[in-house]
Amino acid sequence: MRLSQSVLTALLICVNSAAFANVEVTLPSNSELVLVNGKESDSTDKLTLENGENQLALRYIGRYQQQGSQTQFSSDVIIMTFLAENTSLTIALPRIRSNSAADAFNRDPKISLKNSSEVDIAFRQDKLLKEGMQLGRDYEKEVAEYNSNNQVASVAALAPSITALVQAKPVVIENHGQPKNTINQSDQVNVGQMLDFWYQQADEETRKAFKLKINSKE
């Protein structure tokens, strides 16, 4: 059974479409991936992302010789957001060989994003900065807040919903209409038992005085 040329062409198109049904991103060896679309990822050198808008958070990591000593450099966290479909992309970072180059990169990170044809792909870029202590940072929380504030590289779809924010911060309502020092039912029973006990132990005169006291309170 022979297949017509049109059928073969259609099959070939389907195969090619299946081969590029998403976006593949190759990461440079001198980078550390922090988050992918607001979530942690185990990937180290290659990512497979859905078509559409995607957001990566990464940093430059590397070593260089400075005045005879080995220096370890880790940059600020960089956020890059891009729009792509059915393609293969490559991220490239410059080589850093001095303290001045490291400082310059932190001030203004130079990153390139190209497709398989070496054509530059447009993307939005920003830095995820935090003042004070840097250890133990919650990057997922920071990026969620970043995306909620309409920043340069923010993605509205990755911002937490209003419902999630309400659930995360439960509202405590105080009832000011009732006294705070309320006595529960079990305490009331214990008090009644104690009063009954002392009433039985009292003489007749004390019992009369107790009754008058109770009646005056009603």
UniProtKB/Swiss-Prot annotation:
InterPro entries: UPF0319 (IPR018635). Residues 1-21 form the signal peptide. Keywords: Signal. Transmembrane segments: none annotated. The keyword RNA-binding does not apply. It comes from the Bacteria. Belongs to the UPF0319 family. This is UPF0319 protein swp_2242.
